[in-house]
């Protein structure tokens, strides 16, 4: 299947381009109180080193808004303010923030939205129309119920509202907590506008459940060419959100970066400690940004075949094994020497690619 991404309008959040031909960016959201400036900066630095591109923060009141101004001045990443109920907070934050997310289900009247738009237009920052299945405007929930039709009605209504105000720096999200409904919502809206989409399954749960739900929903949409920026929503797992999001992009084949590790699940043929080896390899290669296929296999049944498609590979045997690079055996060593030599070959491969 040939991957073909929808051509969307391009916007900018800080120094990060979204839409058009820009790479799909990965977002997260802080879970500390925004008024805790030091706590927020600590989490922002963690996300920066984890590989996040953009971060969103909640803003409940003016204490949060004033703290956010200080945080923004020291942040290593572009920041989006997440606004519910009080549009005046969005207007205040628009003076210094990189983007605003509004929930059309609770932001209030047209006049409220108009004030937010004027503030964002003045600073040329984008607005995300964040439609959420759990908080749709009454006019649409009364007419359709809490379903895809109501979400679609809300999105189209608010898009037109912003366009009528001559505002087009828009991105849209259509989030639900259900995998199938999330897919259907984004698919329904995609042919009807050319604005970039922010993908996510809302309230996806803890690490295990979020990984499963997000992989199915976001992977499905990405393979259909839908999506310009994304978040894997995960209860209490900051860096893991980024790691899973990057893995979805890589393993779907949509965006090549970092190491793709091929390893067998082990069986009765294994005569080495493959599980220990793969844990070491994962830890020692997680810093690599260059796209690289590596294979760590426990016996000869599939090892040599997988090695032909890998940049660097290990084929374990009984008390010994092979290190293979681009299909050619480069070393036959004792088991306790294999992983170290393998990692040297991996680093050498990375250096060669970085030179190119």
UniProtKB/Swiss-Prot annotation:
Q: List, alphabetically, the Gene3D superfamilies matched.
A: Dihydropteroate synthase-like (3.20.20.20), Sulfite Reductase Hemoprotein, domain 1 (3.30.413.10)
What does the record say about how the cofactor binds?
Binds 1 [4Fe-4S] cluster.
Q: Which cofactor does it need?
A: [4Fe-4S] cluster
By its UniProt entry, which HAMAP family does this protein fall under?
A: IspG
Q: Which gene is the coding source of this polypeptide chain?
A: ispG
EC numbers for this chain:
1.17.7.3
SUPFAM superfamilies membership: Dihydropteroate synthetase-like (SSF51717), Nitrite and sulphite reductase 4Fe-4S domain-like (SSF56014)
- Give the first-level EC class, as a single word: oxidoreductase
What does the record give as the function of this protein? Converts 2C-methyl-D-erythritol 2,4-cyclodiphosphate (ME-2,4cPP) into 1-hydroxy-2-methyl-2-(E)-butenyl 4-diphosphate.
Protein name per Swiss-Prot or TrEMBL: 4-hydroxy-3-methylbut-2-en-1-yl diphosphate synthase (flavodoxin)
Q: Name one matching Pfam family.
A: GcpE
Record key words, sorted: 4Fe-4S, Iron, Iron-sulfur, Isoprene biosynthesis, Metal-binding, Oxidoreductase
Q: Which family does it belong to?
A: Belongs to the IspG family.
The record's catalysed reaction(s) read: (2E)-4-hydroxy-3-methylbut-2-enyl diphosphate + oxidized [flavodoxin] + H2O + 2 H(+) = 2-C-methyl-D-erythritol 2,4-cyclic diphosphate + reduced [flavodoxin]
């Amino acid at each position: 299947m040939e991957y073909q991404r929808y051509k969307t309008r391009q916007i900018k959040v800080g120094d990060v381009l979204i839409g058009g031909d820009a790479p799909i960016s990965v977002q997260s959201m802080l879970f500390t109180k925004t008024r805790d400036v030091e706590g927020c900066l600590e989490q922002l630095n963690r996300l920066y080193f984890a590989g996040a591109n953009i971060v969103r923060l909640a803003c409940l009141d003016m204490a949060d808004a004033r703290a956010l101004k200080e945080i923004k001045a020291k942040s290593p990443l572009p920041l989006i303010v997440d606004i519910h109920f009080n549009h005046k907070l969005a207007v205040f934050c628009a003076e210094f923030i990189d983007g605003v997310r509004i929930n059309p289900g609770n932001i209030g009247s047209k006049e409220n939205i108009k004030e937010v738009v004027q503030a964002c237009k003045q600073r040329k920052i984008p607005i995300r129309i964040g439609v959420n299945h759990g908080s749709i405007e009454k006019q649409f929930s009364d007419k359709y119920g809490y379903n895809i039709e109501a979400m679609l009605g809300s999105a189209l209504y608010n898009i037109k509202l912003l366009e009528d105000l001559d505002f087009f720096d828009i991105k849209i999200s259509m989030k639900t907590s259900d995998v199938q409904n999330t897919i259907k919502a984004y698919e329904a809206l995609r042919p009807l506008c050319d604005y970039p989409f922010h993908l996510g399954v809302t309230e996806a749960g803890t690490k295990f459940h979020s990984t499963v739900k997000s992989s199915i929903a976001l992977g499905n949409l990405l393979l259909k060419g839908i999506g310009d920026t994304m978040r894997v929503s995960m209860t209490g797992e900051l860096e893991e959100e980024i790691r899973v999001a990057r893995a979805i992009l890589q393993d779907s084949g949509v965006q090549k970066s970092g190491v793709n590790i091929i390893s067998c699940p082990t069986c009765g043929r294994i005569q080495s400690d493959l599980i220990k080896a793969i844990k070491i390899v994962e830890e020692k290669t997680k810093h690599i940004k260059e796209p690289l296929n590596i294979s760590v296999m426990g016996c000869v049944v599939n090892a040599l075949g997988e090695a032909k498609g890998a940049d660097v590979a290990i084929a374990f045997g009984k008390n010994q094994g092979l290190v293979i690079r681009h299909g050619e055996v480069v070393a036959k060593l004792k088991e306790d020497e294999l992983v170290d030599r393998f990692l040297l070959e991996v680093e050498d491969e990375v250096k060669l690619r970085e030179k190119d």
